[in-house]
């Protein structure tokens, strides 16, 4: 798929414009759509098992929903405020909105076609049917009985007409607009019926292996909802609203302020209207009028709406042959019990005192490393304090319950809970209240900043000393995601790092101002500057004839200052390899600007999420892992933490991971100078397969089951 706005020839900067020339920058939003297209390509890939392809269709939809709720809402807000301010790529908000709409329409068509023409027939051959009532072969009286007993009681038809205005449509809800005629006359009217997929399964399984869309069952029984009327026609539609919001840092009660904004989020401005492609033109026009949306906000969708619910089908019991071979994260060798008796648990403190440890998720286990650290700390009578940052966590995580146990046992339990973690606010509010009820110290960070750092600090009394046990990660302490997201966790008892992390917690809980530390890098005050210095030192090493190289792995590369620094390094001749899973605004391969830069994106079985920054500075090496991407929001508006990896064996492990990422030729796309992402095809190397094998070897096993 091509966009004229992003697929421009690779040329050097215009005279006088230098490295700020808009032609040197790819648009942030269009680059994100490129990433979601890569997800869609996996759904289209016949080499993927069919239920995995269905899962990727679901992920594509969920991703796109969030993109509209946050990013498109932001563009729309700029248009409505008549802002003509352009980003580094020079695209105005109005032109960007048109480009987004055109790109999404093309992706939507591919998305719908993949389900209807490819995956549905393939699944049917395997005994899994996604069909409407009419095609199911199930007797009508069976449907009638199911509708009356299970669906009808949950429905609430809402009339639209004089004295009955068009009802409020909640964000991402699925609805039927029904056109009616009074059987006793010529009066025509409309009504809205919400599809109650929040309380009922989206796909009804009256017979095993047959999935019938809930909205189709409702549509087949509309006359039961409107006795005495004739149903002329109906149309399915879905609304997406602005779900982004800001909370004043001056609020007296931040928790209450976030709760208030969450209630207001339901009433955000409409940013997208999706309508079933078979809709009557008159009904479509009424929806556009009632919802007050612009033409480029209306999307006609072929087939089913809201394919995020396909996850229900993808998770059907059985059918192992239609899925990837399951993977069980391995316990890191350092965290295995020394004694193998039943129920024996490793002494994680002893393991950390022995050496620094680098754990790679999901190849290695989150539960036997991160969760075990907090659980053991909560139970250990010599532990004085446990301090944790929580950005996102899961209901089944042992982290917060362990903190509650620690507080109840009289330990100092400190939890920095980020209430403004988007779409995790409600859960974080709940955790905050539960922790406060048992006497834990709960704080919500620094005014004006989100706390995105991922760290745990355990303070333990040992003989006559106090020792710091520190874990610093690249991803959230989220048990479920740790089985799907690729991340690193670094465990250390370094006195220096322990003190610096303690300083960070003091800045989060008190009035201490974050400062530049000798070892760790912290945003917003001391991260961009040190990283730019490292790039400059790499340039100096190269010019001096010493070995020099930059290798960076991240989720997104957006920050203009960092991009310009990488361009300068490339102009000096420094080899640069970038592994950027999602958004990349840097344009590689531009003559005279970025000829030595290669950009690769890995999208596959696991979500690449770790951040690894490596600099060869002549005889020196600098290597960091942590929570920050190279984006303005991370470097300027968040509390972030990057930790140096100094042990050679751990650096070698990170180097090996990067080598495998750049060598992948099955899950990898390479960014071209004109902005296209080109998939590497016909290869045999998969970084995910290779790292699973590496983890098994380290664990002393060879069994992928």
Predicted regions span which residues?
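N-terminal localization/anchoring segments of enzymes in phospholipid and broader phosphate metabolism
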Residues: 1-550, 568-572, 584-705
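Hydrophobic alpha/beta core scaffold segments
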Residues: 575-579
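Cofactor-pocket helix-loop regions in the catalytic cores of large enzyme subunits
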Residues: 555
């Amino acid at each position: 798929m091509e966009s004229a706005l992003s697929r421009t020839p690779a040329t050097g900067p215009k005279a006088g414009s230098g490295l700020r020339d808009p032609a040197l920058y790819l648009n942030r939003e269009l680059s994100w759509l490129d990433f979601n297209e890569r997800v869609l390509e996996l759904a289209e890939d016949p080499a993927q098992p069919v239920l995995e392809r269905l899962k990727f269709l679901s992920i594509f939809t969920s991703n796109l929903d969030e993109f509209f709720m946050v990013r498109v809402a932001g563009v729309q807000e700029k248009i409505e405020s008549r802002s003509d301010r352009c980003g580094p790529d020079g695209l105005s908000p109005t032109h960007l909105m048109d480009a987004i709409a055109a790109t999404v329409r093309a992706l939507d068509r591919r998305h719908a076609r993949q389900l209807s023409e490819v995956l549905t027939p393939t699944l049917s051959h395997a005994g899994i049917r996604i069909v409407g009532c009419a095609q199911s072969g199930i007797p009508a009286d069976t449907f009638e009985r199911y509708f009356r007993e299970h669906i009808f009681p949950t429905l609430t038809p809402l009339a639209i007409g004089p004295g009955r205005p068009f009802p409020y449509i909640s964000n991402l809800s699925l609805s039927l607009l029904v056109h009616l005629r009074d059987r006793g006359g010529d009066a025509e009217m409309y009504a809205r019926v919400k599809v109650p997929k929040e309380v009922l399964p989206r796909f009804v399984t009256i017979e095993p292996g047959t999935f019938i869309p809930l909205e189709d069952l409702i549509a087949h029984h509309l006359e039961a909802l409107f006795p005495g009327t004739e149903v002329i026609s109906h149309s399915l539609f879905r609304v997406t609203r602005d779900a982004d919001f800001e909370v004043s840092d001056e609020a007296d009660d931040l928790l209450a302020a976030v709760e208030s904004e969450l209630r207001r989020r339901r009433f955000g401005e409409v940013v997208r209207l999706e309508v079933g492609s078979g809709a009557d033109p008159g009904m479509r026009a009424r929806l556009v009028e009632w919802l007050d949306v612009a033409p480029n906000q209306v999307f006609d969708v072929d087939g089913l709406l809201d394919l995020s619910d396909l996850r229900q089908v993808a998770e059907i019991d059985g059918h192992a042959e239609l899925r990837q071979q399951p993977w069980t994260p391995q316990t890191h060798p350092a965290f295995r019990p020394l004694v193998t008796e039943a129920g024996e648990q490793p002494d994680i403190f002893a393991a950390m005192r022995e050496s620094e440890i680098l754990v790679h998720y999901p190849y290695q286990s989150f539960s036997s490393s991160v969760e075990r650290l907090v659980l053991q700390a909560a139970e250990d009578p010599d532990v004085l304090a446990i301090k944790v940052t929580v950005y996102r966590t899961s209901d089944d995580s042992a982290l917060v319950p362990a903190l509650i146990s620690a507080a109840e046992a009289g330990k100092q339990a400190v939890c920095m809970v980020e209430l403004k973690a988007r779409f995790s606010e409600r859960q974080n509010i709940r955790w905050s209240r539960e922790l406060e009820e048992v006497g834990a110290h709960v704080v919500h960070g620094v005014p004006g900043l989100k706390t995105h750092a991922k760290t745990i600090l355990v303070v333990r009394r040992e003989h006559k000393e106090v020792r710091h046990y520190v874990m610093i990660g690249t991803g959230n302490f989220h048990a479920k995601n740790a089985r799907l997201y690729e991340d690193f966790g670094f465990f250390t008892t370094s006195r220096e790092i322990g003190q610096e992390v303690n300083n960070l917690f003091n800045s989060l809980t008190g009035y201490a101002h974050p400062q530049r530390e000798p070892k760790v890098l912290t945003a917003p005050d001391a991260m961009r500057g040190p990283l730019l210095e490292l790039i400059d030192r790499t340039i100096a090493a190269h010019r001096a004839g010493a070995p020099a190289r930059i290798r960076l792995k991240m989720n997104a590369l957006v920050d203009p200052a960092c991009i310009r620094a990488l361009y300068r390094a490339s102009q000096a001749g420094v080899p640069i390899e970038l592994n950027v899973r999602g958004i990349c605004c840097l344009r590689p391969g531009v003559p005279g600007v970025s000829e030595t830069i290669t950009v690769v994106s890995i999208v596959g079985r696991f979500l690449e999420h770790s951040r690894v920054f490596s600099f060869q500075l002549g005889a020196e090496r600098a290597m960091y892992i942590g929570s920050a991407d190279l984006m303005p929001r991370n470097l300027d508006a968040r509390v972030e933490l990057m930790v140096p990896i100094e042990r050679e064996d751990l650096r070698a492990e990170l180097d090996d991971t990067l080598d495998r990422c750049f060598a992948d030729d099955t899950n990898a796309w390479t960014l071209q100078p004109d902005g296209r992402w080109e998939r590497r095809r016909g290869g045999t190397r998969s970084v995910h397969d290779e790292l699973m094998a590496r983890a098994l070897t380290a664990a002393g096993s060879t069994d992928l089951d």
